[in-house]
Structures are given as structure tokens and as C-alpha cells.
Amino acid sequence: MNLKEFVVDVKDFPKQGIVFKDITPLLNNKDAFKYTIDQMADFIKQLDVDVVVAPEARGFLLASAVAYAANKRFVLVRKPNKLPREVYDVEYSLEYGTNHQQIHVGDLKPNDKVVVIDDVLATGGTMQAIIDLVKLSKAEVIGMSFLIDLTFLHDVNLFDQYKVQKLIKY
């Protein structure tokens, strides 16, 4: 299935000069959504992983379904002040400024093997922050799965040390 058919480019969103990849048509099509989840679940079943980790918000949509399909635990990574218990916190750089990602202390167990799922790989900043959170939890990232890879925004060898799945490349 050609998943690109279900992604719509929205120019100048959320700001001038950005071309936003809208995945809602994919989510709205039961066959495309099922195919996406099945592809990601098959990928993580090939890895010896314990946990699926994903950042908000669109990462949650994919990763929770994949975790269910692969019978794996699901752990959330969120922006500050969204998780009610003690958290690990990592600051990371954005194009303009910094942001934070957080994970509950104790959600990942020492030596847990983790696959991270997100909708889009752009510069890799969010993903690196998640890797750092996993390390703080004394767990290990084994692999990553992305619906979309914006190859023009990062080095071609980014995250080569991991098993990486990319369903759509631009």
C-alpha cells in the first residue's frame, strides 16, 4: 500500500514557510491505518523488546495501537507539567529555543528493551531527548519506528546504531 496517498501537505502550517504533513486522512482510512499499525507491529515483533515508548501527541495515536497489536507495554513521554508523578526531565534544542520531554520515574524498569514510535522524524531532537530519558531510566533503546521520515532535515546516518523502520520517506 502506498501510504503517501493518505498524507496531505498543508502549506504554511503551523507557520509561514512550513509544509505540514497531515496524517489525519491516513487515520481516517481504516485500511491505511490498519496497514500502518500492522507494519509497525510486525517490525517490533522482530525485535526483542519489552516496551513501546512514544511522545505526544500523534505518537500516542500510533504507538498505543502498535503496543496493543504486539502485546507490549506502552509508556508515555510528555511535555512538562502533564505527568502527575515524579519524572525524569530532559531539555533539548529546537530550531528556536529549547523544550523539555518527561517520563514517569519507574514506568521503565532497569534493562527494559525499548522501541520508540513517532509519527515524524524531522531533525531528531525529540528522538534524542527520548533516548536520553530511556537511559536515565536505566533502560535501553533497541529500535525506532516512524510513519514519516523527512530525510532532508537530518543526516542520513542519524540513529544508524539502532534498528529503524521508516514507512514513508520524503
Curated annotation (Swiss-Prot):
It comes from the Bacteria. This is Adenine phosphoribosyltransferase. Keywords: Cytoplasm, Glycosyltransferase, Purine salvage, Transferase. The keyword Protein transport does not apply. Belongs to the purine/pyrimidine phosphoribosyltransferase family. Pfam families: Pribosyltran. Catalyzes a salvage reaction resulting in the formation of AMP, that is energically less costly than de novo synthesis. Homodimer. One of its GO terms (molecular function) is adenine binding. One of its GO terms (biological process) is AMP salvage. InterPro entries: Ade_phspho_trans, PRibTrfase_dom, PRTase-like, UPRTase/APRTase. One of its GO terms (cellular component) is cytoplasm. Its EC number is 2.4.2.7. CDD domains: PRTases_typeI. It catalyses: AMP + diphosphate = 5-phospho-alpha-D-ribose 1-diphosphate + adenine. Pathway: Purine metabolism; AMP biosynthesis via salvage pathway; AMP from adenine: step 1/1. It is found in: Cytoplasm. Signal peptide: none annotated.
